[in-house]
């Protein structure tokens, strides 16, 4: 259920864009992200930092898009969010406090060097997505960018998540691998 809630704003943004335009879709994205926070809090009695940061970015850049009637702001939001994720992961790893390990370390007990590799992989992934977003957003038609944002980045993230799980699984201790089968 929680993962479905994460996709709610994206689905609403895409649907509203297809029926109206980027400006109405930006307003809908702000509303849908606020609704996501409300429902998440009602169901789970807590909010993750990632959701709060995303909501803040959506609200700021969505509002700027609407006020200035300029879709550049909503396009930049994607790159800025991915950049923040890359920076947060990279800094946490440099401080030997892996965010990924703190999130998944109880379920998947692998060596710190494996967590470091996975973390740097995600730093590169998020930074690359941010750069590719800049290219797609400002070199290709708006509709192409919307499709890339909704389908391309989502698919890339899901593929990378699966690859990460397989990589971590490969490095699990034998007894923990047996538990997961």
From Swiss-Prot:
Membrane topology (UniProt): Multi-pass membrane protein
Keyword Transmembrane: yes
Reported function: Plays a role in cell envelope biogenesis, maintenance of cell envelope integrity and membrane homeostasis.
Transmembrane regions: 10-30, 50-70, 80-100, 118-138, 148-168
Subcellular location: Cell inner membrane
Keywords per UniProt: Cell inner membrane, Cell membrane, Membrane, Transmembrane, Transmembrane helix
Signal sequence extent: none
Recorded coiled-coil stretches: none
Pfam families xrefs: IspA (PF04279)
GO cellular component, one term: plasma membrane
Predominant location: membrane
Gene name of the encoded protein: yciB
Similarity section: Belongs to the YciB family.
Name the record gives this protein: Inner membrane-spanning protein YciB
InterPro entries: YciB
């Amino acid at each position: 259920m929680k993962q479905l809630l994460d996709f709610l704003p994206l689905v609403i943004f895409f649907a509203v864009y297809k029926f109206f335009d980027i400006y109405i879709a930006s307003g809908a994205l702000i509303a849908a992200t606020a609704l996501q926070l409300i429902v998440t809090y009602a169901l789970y009695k807590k909010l993750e930092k990632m959701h709060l940061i995303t909501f803040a970015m959506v609200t700021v850049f969505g509002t700027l898009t609407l006020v200035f009637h300029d879709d550049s702001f909503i396009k930049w939001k994607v790159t800025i969010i991915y950049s923040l994720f890359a920076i947060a992961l990279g800094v946490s790893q440099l401080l030997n406090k892996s965010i990924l390990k703190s999130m998944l370390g109880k379920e998947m007990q692998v060596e710190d060097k494996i967590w470091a590799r996975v973390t740097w992989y995600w730093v590169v992934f998020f930074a690359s997505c941010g750069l590719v977003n800049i290219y797609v957003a400002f070199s290709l038609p708006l509709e192409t960018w919307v499709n890339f944002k909704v389908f391309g980045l989502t698919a890339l993230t899901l593929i990378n998540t699966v690859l990460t799980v397989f990589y971590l699984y490969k490095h699990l201790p034998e007894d923990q691998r047996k538990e997961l089968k």
